[in-house]
Amino acid sequence: MKVVAMNSEDCILFSGAAAGAESAFGEAAERHGIEEVNFTFEGHKDERTRGIRVLTHLELKQGDVSLAYLSRLMNRTYSNTPLFRRVLQSIWHQINNGQEIFVIGHILKDGTVKGGTGWGAEFAKLCNKPLYVFDQDDNSWRRWTGDAWVAESNPKITHTHFAGTGTRILQPNGKKAINDLFDRSF
C-alpha cells in the first residue's frame, strides 16, 4: 500500500519562535508552505516573526502548573522566576494545540527530557499524545509508547496540527533530523 504524504496546506505547526529547535521547526514549516503559530509573551526574545501569537496574561494563566508538582514529576528543581514560569506556560499552549508532538533534546536516564523542554514532553505524555524525541546525544529518534521510549527510525508527521519544540542548543544532527522529518512527511 502506498503511503501518501501529508498535504502541507492543511497543516499547522505550533511552536514557540525561540532560537534553536523552535526556530528550525519554523524554518522547515515555512519551506514546506505550512502555517505556523508561534506562542510567545511580552518580553520574550523571539527568533522567528512568522505566525507570532502573543499570549495574554489570562491565556498564560491557563497553562500555569505547580512548580512543586513539576519538580516531583521531573525529578529536578526548577527556579520560580516569572520568566521561567511564562516559558512553561507558553510550552503548555504548544502541546495543548498539537495533536502530535516532536521534540529535539536529550532523554535522561529517568526517562524525562532535559531542561524546560522536558515539561513539554511530560505534558504530552500526560495528555496521551503521540510523542517523538530526537536525542541529539544518541543521534536517534525515540517514540513514547505509554510505558517506555523505543527506537523510531524514520518518524513522519501524521496529524494536521502538530507541535515542534526543543532545546535552544540545536546541534547540526538535530537540525538535520528536523529537515529530514519534514522532507519525509511532505
Region locations from a protein language model:
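Acidic/glycine-enriched connector segments
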Residues: 3-186
